[in-house]
């Protein structure tokens, strides 16, 4: 078998970064970038093995945030500013998981897009 070809992950030494939490009704995605926007690590509830409706739970967001934080701290990340987007259930639990992992949060910014009467929303569910 030929040896596996691919980029060897270079260990960067980054002290501060930006965490983007995209929380939808179906999933929670966490991306950790440096100051210029290069991705250091990422994780999501689906990537951590949650399937279907379990992806949208706060616990799945907590696991995904802890995983992304652990990967980023291998590169020397210590302080982060957080950008939260979306209406999902995993917003607060992802924030708590980041601080519990040992990252110092300096700023929390909510950039959830709010329409000024744009597209028609999906119809209401009748259960």
UniProtKB/Swiss-Prot annotation:
Cysteines paired by S-S bonds: none
Pfam families: Ribosomal_S11
Cited PROSITE patterns: RIBOSOMAL_S11 (PS00054)
InterPro entries referenced in this protein's UniProt entry, alphabetically: Ribosomal_uS11 (IPR001971), Ribosomal_uS11_bac-type (IPR019981), Ribosomal_uS11_CS (IPR018102), Ribosomal_uS11_sf (IPR036967)
UniProt keyword Signal, yes or no: no
A GO CC annotation given for this chain: ribosome
UniProt keywords, alphabetically: Ribonucleoprotein, Ribosomal protein, RNA-binding, rRNA-binding
GO BP annotations, alphabetical order: translation
GO MF entry, a single one: structural constituent of ribosome
Keyword Ribonucleoprotein attached: yes
Top-level taxon: Bacteria
SUPFAM superfamilies per record: Translational machinery components
NCBIfam families on file: PRK05309.1, uS11_bact
Known role: Located on the platform of the 30S subunit, it bridges several disparate RNA helices of the 16S rRNA. Forms part of the Shine-Dalgarno cleft in the 70S ribosome.
Assembly with partners or alone: Part of the 30S ribosomal subunit. Interacts with proteins S7 and S18. Binds to IF-3.
Family: Belongs to the universal ribosomal protein uS11 family.
Protein name: Small ribosomal subunit protein uS11
């Amino acid at each position: 078998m030929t040896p596996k070809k691919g980029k060897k992950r270079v260990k960067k030494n980054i002290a501060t970064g930006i965490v983007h939490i995209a929380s939808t009704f179906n999933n929670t995605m966490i991306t950790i970038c440096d100051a210029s926007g290069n991705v250091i690590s990422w994780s999501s509830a689906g990537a951590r093995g949650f399937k279907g409706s379990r992806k949208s739970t706060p616990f799945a967001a907590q696991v995904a945030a802890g995983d992304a934080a652990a990967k980023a701290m291998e590169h020397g990340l210590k302080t982060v500013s957080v950008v939260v987007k979306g209406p999902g259930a995993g917003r607060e639990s992802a924030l708590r998981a980041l601080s519990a992992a040992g990252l110092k949060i300096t700023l929390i910014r909510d950039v959830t897009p709010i329409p000024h009467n744009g597209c028609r929303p999906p119809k209401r569910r009748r259960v």
